[in-house]
């Protein structure tokens, strides 16, 4: 509350946000923390964004946060990555994500803005990595390549890592534009 009142911060993002709704019986969107924030005249007016997962049981809660909250939409991330990679997801899956993921957020008065669409984040591949590597390469950081996510849904388009092959570079740049155009024009936040 101090940050909103005195520092004029107008929004907060909560990493591993599902923990905020943990009650003795599991995740509850009407739990104590959410209820307190919803009743506070100042905090209920700021932007609240939760990463809707944590490592606990029942930790995956995409679409489960209360009205007034937005959530990272990993369904958007995975579907769009697969779509531009020409894998598993159908045009219908892509259309659902592009039009705001109503199947996830269109309940309890929530609208497409409840989903925060993203392609990459702080704890995974960058957009450049997404079109340059089939797998992660974190060998040099002392973790024996065990850190980071293994399901990146990426493609190197013909060469792992940096390349001077003009054809591959052109495809990678086009794919970056495809990803960004999809993100910018999709419904959601």
Regions found by a protein language model. Give the residues of each.
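Conserved alpha/beta catalytic core and glycan-binding cleft of carbohydrate-active enzymes
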Residues: 8, 23, 29-189
């Amino acid at each position: 509350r101090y940050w909103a009142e005195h520092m004029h911060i107008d929004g907060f993002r909560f990493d591993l946000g599902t923990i905020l709704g943990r009650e003795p019986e599991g995740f509850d969107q009407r739990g104590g923390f959410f209820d307190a924030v919803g009743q506070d005249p100042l905090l209920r007016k700021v932007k609240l964004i939760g990463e809707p997962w944590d490592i606990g049981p029942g930790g995956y809660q995409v679409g489960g946060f209360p009205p007034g909250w937005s959530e990272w939409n990993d369904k958007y991330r995975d579907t769009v990555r697969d779509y531009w990679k020409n894998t598993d997801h159908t045009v219908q899956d892509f259309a659902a994500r592009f039009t705001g993921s109503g199947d996830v957020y269109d309940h309890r008065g929530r609208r497409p803005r409840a989903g925060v669409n993203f392609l990459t984040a702080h704890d995974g591949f960058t957009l450049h990595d997404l079109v340059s590597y089939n797998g992660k390469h974190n060998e040099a950081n002392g973790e024996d390549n065990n850190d980071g996510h293994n399901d990146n849904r990426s493609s190197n388009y013909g060469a792992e890592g940096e390349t001077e092959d003009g054809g591959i570079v052109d495809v990678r740049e086009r794919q970056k534009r495809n990803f960004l155009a999809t993100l910018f024009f999709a419904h959601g936040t």
